[in-house]
Regions:
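P-loop NTPase motor core
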Residues: 317-348, 363
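N-terminal accessory beta-strand-rich subdomains and adjacent acidic, glycine-rich linkers
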Residues: 1-158, 515
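Glycan-recognition surfaces
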Residues: 266, 271-300, 304, 343-441
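Carbohydrate-binding surface patches
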Residues: 426, 472-522
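Aromatic-lined carbohydrate-binding/catalytic grooves of carbohydrate-active enzymes
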Residues: 168-172, 176-307, 311, 315-317, ...
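Alpha-helix-loop-beta-strand connector modules within alpha/beta enzyme cores
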Residues: 239-248, 253, 337-356
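C-terminal beta-strand-rich structural cap/linker in extracellular carbohydrate-active enzymes
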Residues: 517-545
Length: 545
């Protein structure tokens, strides 16, 4: 396998040959090679299209069972990661390629060549003065493709950071329930009910920094984010907010506030200043704009204002959103600036509160961001428990065991069946459960299902927190997941029942569309009633002898 290195003008200055073996091989990109490349490095190589039937990058929420004519993956510290794996129909990897430089802006381009029966690949990396020596890795072992992502992660971060206990607490979030239309009495009524159900973290989402009260719909979308960006608490909407935070914390909650440091609204004062400084990277059709993280205003004004609210209101954490709004770019690279500001924000939050909770969203739940976050959440999937499952499993595949992967908030129609509510809860157990609903309007039957699964989560938290996770795929879809420790295995069956463990308790949850014949000591339906077979939304308990 020939690897060709060139500069931005396509002048080749280095080549290497890797053996055609089922091994892990790497090429060191030295400081001398970085110097010779200048500001742009290109790495070219090819992949024979032999027993390849699918691929996966972090851009996809599930593996793709087709061959792309033209594939492009842009990555930087704040969005996606420089990793690609090709696999066969059984999901066994045929090759994985990645860079250990995850901070710099990079773009991978793959083109299918019919005449040569191969993929022609080129990685372009925009280098910076801070770029250190790194590796280009070709892993051609034949293993289940999720193991390739694990190998990538372990090469970058051999050991996980320590995460605060609160990162494993089930979360109540206001977003789908209220959007930006809420009052303090409504928030506290829902906090009280959420606490009774077993939730221990309360996220106040968008809406706290402006007076307008609104729900997300076709009339509000065009200017939804227009008032964000100044990060000053709305005393009109939330009078006595610090006292409110104390009351909710006294109920046993961690209180977390939504922020978006790189997003500014077109009606904000900050937007005008950024515009004057030519520091707007992107205008969107929802009233928002992406602020340039290289602009001093972000570090000198935005982050201090966010920290001021955090300190003054005695908060427990921040939901740090839209970091990925700053897109990877070879012309305006901002990966390192984003990483620097997120690191500063995390350090200053932890200086105030060492166990501060910091939520990141899916596109930046990557090894590069692992040291700076505590809660790594699936991207938005309202009403869709199957996609929530897939997104939790993808983050788990990227970040591995012992990391607080969080489900996107569960939300469902008021007249949804209890079976489907149970399915929502089972899917969320691929991570830490999160819910967003006006609990004053939820039926007693739905509340009972939620309460039951929250009790199950708390009872088995040690396994979820410290166990080893296995995600099994079948033709591009999650077939099952398991998490196990020394004493028990917990599993969810979607299209298959995973093999039972030897000498351990086995708990099986049914996320499939049909009854599952399964021998167990106890089988319960979605409501907790005894059942003869394992129905959808049910749980079976098989004890070891």
């Amino acid at each position: 396998m020939k690897i060709v290195f060139s500069d931005g003008r396509d002048s080749v200055f280095h080549t290497e040959e890797l053996p055609d073996t089922r091994t892990v091989d790497s090429v060191a990109v030295t400081q001398e090679m970085i110097r010779r490349a200048g500001d742009t490095l290109k790495i070219r190589f090819t992949q024979p299209i032999r027993n390849i039937h699918g691929y996966w990058t972090s851009e996809q929420y599930r593996p793709q069972m087709q061959l792309p004519w033209d594939l492009k993956l842009d990555s930087a510290a704040q969005r996606q990661m420089p990793f690609l794996v090709w696999f066969d129909q059984a999901g066994v990897s045929q090759s994985a390629f990645y860079l250990t430089d995850t901070a710099d802006d990079a773009s991978l381009h793959s083109q299918l060549s019919q005449s040569d029966s191969e993929f022609r690949l080129e990685w372009t990396i925009r280098l910076s003065p801070e770029t250190q020596a790194f590796e280009f890795v070709a892993d051609r072992r034949q293993l289940p493709f999720p193991d390739m992502a694990a190998s990538f992660r372990q090469r970058l971060i051999p050991d996980n950071p320590d995460f605060p206990a609160g990162a494993w607490d089930p979360v109540y979030c206001t977003w789908y329930a209220f959007h930006a239309a809420y009052t303090i009495p409504e928030l506290e009524k829902n906090a009280a009910l959420a606490g009774e159900l077993g939730f221990r973290t309360f996220i106040l989402d968008d809406g706290w920094s402006y007076d307008t009260s609104k729900r997300l719909n076709s009339s509000t979308v065009p200017e939804w984010f227009s008032e964000n960006g100044d990060w000053i608490l709305s005393e009109r909407k939330l009078p006595g907010f610090a006292d409110h935070v104390k009351r909710v914390r006294d109920m046993g909650f961690n209180y977390v506030l939504w922020v978006a440091p790189f997003l500014t609204g077109r009606s904000s004062r900050l937007y005008a200043e950024l515009k004057k400084a030519n520091a707007i990277l992107l205008e969107s059709d929802d009233g928002s704009a992406a602020a340039d993280p290289a602009c001093p205003l972000i570090g000198e004004l935005v982050i201090p204002r966010i920290l001021e609210v955090f300190r003054n209101c005695h908060l427990d954490g921040l939901k740090v959103d839209f970091v990925d709004f700053v897109r990877p770019s070879l012309t305006i690279p901002r990966g390192r600036e984003c990483l620097k500001l997120i690191r500063i924000l995390a350090e200053q939050l932890r200086a105030v509160k060492p166990d501060a909770l910091i939520e990141f969203r899916q596109r930046y739940t990557t090894p590069a961001m692992l040291p700076y976050g505590t809660n790594f959440r699936a991207n938005d999937v309202p009403f869709d428990y199957l996609e929530n499952l897939h997104r939790c499993c993808q983050i788990r595949m990227i970040l591995g065991d012992g990391v607080p992967v969080h489900a996107d908030p569960i939300c469902f129609h008021p007249e949804e069946s209890c079976v489907n509510v149970a399915r929502h809860l089972i899917a969320s157990l691929a991570g830490v459960p999160m819910l967003s609903a006006d609990l004053t309007k939820i039926s007693p039957e739905h509340l009972a299902v939620i309460r039951r699964f929250m009790r199950f989560y708390h009872d088995h938290l040690t396994t979820f927190r410290t166990g080893h996770w296995t995600i099994r795929y079948d033709f591009g879809h999650v077939a099952s997941f398991t998490v196990e420790n020394e004493t028990e295995m917990i599993a969810a069956a979607v299209t298959e029942i995973p093999p039972a463990p030897a000498g351990k308790n086995f708990i099986l949850m049914n996320l499939s569309a049909e009854d599952l014949p399964f021998e167990a000591d106890r089988i319960e339906d979605c409501d907790g009633n005894a059942a003869a077979v394992l129905p959808p939304g049910g749980i079976a308990f098989q004890k070891t002898n």
